[in-house]
Amino acid sequence: MEPTGIVVLDKPKGWTSHDCVHQMRKWFQTRKVGHTGTLDPEVDGVLPICIGKATKVVKYMSDYDKTYIGEVTFGVATTTEDAHGEVVEEKRVNKPFTRTEIEALLQAFIGKIEQTPPYYSAVKVNGKRLYEYARAGIEVERPTRTVEIKALTLTEITTAKPGCFSFAFSVTCTKGTYIRTLAVDIGKKAGYPAHMSKLTRTASGPFTQADAIPLSAFAEMSLDERLNKLRPLDTALQHFPRVTADKELEKRIRNGAVLEKSASFGDGRFLFYNEQGDCLALYQAHPTKAGLIKPETLFCHV
């Protein structure tokens, strides 16, 4: 039987998200593996990876809010907006900022904001990724995007090299937010070039660092031990309401039937479970037929 479930991985620094997917394909002996939100190589932390038929839920996990802890450094800007790029601007910070000043700066970024993705990013413009233009030395107009910062807090003032100022922060944001760019924009508001000097993802939707298993620990496991670490695919769908189907309704759902809408189903998408607690399907309102609902994704044979 094909392995199916979700691995909550604690990705180490130095690995790309694709590296992790490649390794999971080897360990679980299946090609059907997908991750749910890229982490840059030098960013560590929570990376949920879907195995086997659990890849059906990747599209729902990509919309998760993410939480990070990191560090911003004022005084130096880089090509990549993080600590690994070439220095492009420097301005000495002669006087340290107070906690009150930093907290006021951060407050200005809470809510919906506009971001311009960094040149060294995977965003596509005219069919090519921005990092391809950057490596070729070609400047192009970068599209802005609206993202939402749901929480942004100062955790501590950290030690910086002479002429710089650094602080640690925690942020919760919507998908597509570039924390590197957020760090740069905070610096601009403070009047200094800046970059993101550290970053760790601590949560992706319902999956937290407390759930995550280090890659090094997976490497030491047998196949059976790895299979035991797989979480059911519906743990990724906790944000959808659930309805229990009786045996007769279960038969119809398994056949992908269009059903009459019931008041108990609510107005949005929801999950059907059978009486044994197995996740059967995600249903939605029929797009053209009022009063009916149809399956969006079937999980019956998982």
Swiss-Prot record:
Family the entry assigns: Belongs to the pseudouridine synthase TruB family. Type 1 subfamily.
Gene Ontology molecular function, alphabetical: RNA binding; tRNA pseudouridine(55) synthase activity
Organism: Shouchella clausii (strain KSM-K16) (Alkalihalobacillus clausii)
Catalytic activity: uridine(55) in tRNA = pseudouridine(55) in tRNA
GO BP terms in the entry: mRNA pseudouridine synthesis; tRNA pseudouridine synthesis
Active site per database record: D40
Protein name listed in UniProt: tRNA pseudouridine synthase B
EC number annotated for this UniProt entry: 5.4.99.25
InterPro entries with a match to the protein in the record: PsdUridine_synth_cat_dom_sf (IPR020103), PsdUridine_synth_N (IPR002501), tRNA_psdUridine_synth_TruB (IPR014780), TruB_C (IPR032819)
